[in-house]
Regions:
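Cross-family detector of peptidyl-prolyl cis-trans isomerase
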Residues: 1-131
């Protein structure tokens, strides 16, 4: 499924649901903190990274706040279109990944393939509208 970013109609990712959607569960907001298990590959299948060895918040869990500037736009878009408990495969075009930058084995203009499982939303913050 093509998922288009509401903030930029030219920005998109491709998502394939593996397990889900768990529609009775929450969907994170842009300010939520999420717990995700992931495997990252280049589009050609070359393994790049995984949350497997992260132990800080539980076995293999990567915790992040979705409005963190350190996250790529495609990750944020994918996770905000998942329910807690969902597993998806996501193709992220280079424009929503690292763009023209390189990072380790990720070369400029690289599309990325993530396998994501949204394990939990430990902090479901609501947007602060100046209150």
């Amino acid at each position: 499924t093509k998922v288009v970013a509401p903030w930029d109609v030219s920005a998109y990712i491709l998502m394939h649901t593996i397990d889900g959607p768990h529609t009775d569960n929450l969907v994170p907001l842009s300010t939520s903190t999420t717990d995700v298990r992931y495997h990252l590959h280049l589009y050609d299948g070359t393994p790049v990274d995984s949350s497997t060895n992260i132990k800080t918040y539980g076995d293999g869990i990567f915790r992040s706040r979705l409005n963190d500037d350190g996250l790529i736009a495609g990750w944020k878009l994918a996770v905000q279109n998942m329910h807690a408990g969902d597993s998806v495969e996501v193709i992220i075009p280079y424009t929503q990944a690292y763009g023209t930058q390189s990072l380790g084995v990720i070369k400029p203009y690289s599309a990325l393939r993530f396998n994501l499982r949204l394990v939990d939303i430990p902090f479901y913050e609501l947007p602060n509208y100046g209150n």
